[in-house]
């Protein structure tokens, strides 16, 4: 009699394991393995370089009249390097922003679902143990 009681439970475990196995394989095969930088870090670096470029463009040597316009090659190279760095950061921030706003995948539901199934199984085991020990 006890053997018949556990047969549906065993079938249920096999079905759940099969569902998890089929759901994990396609998602893990399509997973992106390249690490993406954090968006907040990119925004902070972008703001800092943008501020530096803004202060360089508003400095007295850059805003002098055309008669006094003697730009040092090192200063212009530094300003162009900073502007190139800000465009690189802007491009990386845009690319990381595009990849961050995707819909949740199956993998984000596997953990909570497995925890829920495990909790239900443990509660059922405790109830079955108490029921058997009371007889």
Curated annotation (Swiss-Prot):
Membrane-spanning ranges: 109-129
Subcellular location: Secreted; Host membrane
Keyword Membrane: yes
Residue span of region Disordered: 56-97
Membrane topology recorded in Swiss-Prot or TrEMBL: Single-pass type I membrane protein
Composition skew (Low complexity), residue ranges: 57-69
One GO CC term, this protein: extracellular region
Alphabetical keyword list: Glycoprotein, Host membrane, Membrane, Secreted, Signal, Transmembrane, Transmembrane helix
Glycosylated sites: 84
Signal sequence bounds: 1-29
Motif (RxLR): 38-41
Disulfide bond entries: none
Family: Belongs to the RxLR effector family.
Domain notes: Has the canonical translocation RxLR motif, but lacks the canonical EER motif, which characterizes most oomycete effectors identified so far.
Reported function: Secreted effector that inhibits stress-induced relocalization of the transcription factor NAC069 to the nucleus, thus affecting its broad role in abiotic and biotic stress responses.
Self-association state and partner proteins as the record states: Interacts with host transcription factor NAC069.
Protein name: Secreted RxLR effector protein BLR08
Species this protein is from: Bremia lactucae (Lettuce downy mildew)
Gene name as annotated: BLR08
